[in-house]
Amino acid sequence: MKNLLLGLILTLLGAQGAFAQNASAEQEIRNLSQEKWQWMSDKNVDELGNLFHEKAVFVHMGGSWGTKQELDIIESGGIWYKKADIHEVSVNIIDDTAILLNRIDLLAEVGGNEVTNPFEVTEVYVKQGDSWKLGSLSFTRLLSRPEE
């Protein structure tokens, strides 16, 4: 009976530790996403280059491309992510992969024209060693803005 009770206690403590680690990873991803929006606004391609995985994919309304093209577009101002008003964020951790969903209104300058669009943005992060790398960033334009 003692062994059973001890096993149950150790299992519960292990589950609590796993939950705490997961909550910590979720907060780390939320913070990283927030920093990413600021770096994109600032056109900080050095920080973004460290964050983006070399094989990352970026899906926009106008097409999809890889890391080098995304960094070139940001640096040149082809797309200037001026401000992301974030309304909702959710994070799901699956092993060494984090999937973050943002519901945002994005103020951007595209080809010299300033536009604001509602998006559901999917960010996929992969844990490599001690750091997270962005593996995918996809913008899905929403047809209507959900009620707050």
Which residues make up each language-model segment?
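Positively charged n-region of N-terminal signal peptides that target proteins for export
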Residues: M1-L5, A20
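Bacterial N-terminal signal peptides
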Residues: G7-Q16
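A beta-strand edge to alpha-helix "cap/lid" segment located at domain peripheries
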Residues: Q21-N50, K55-E148
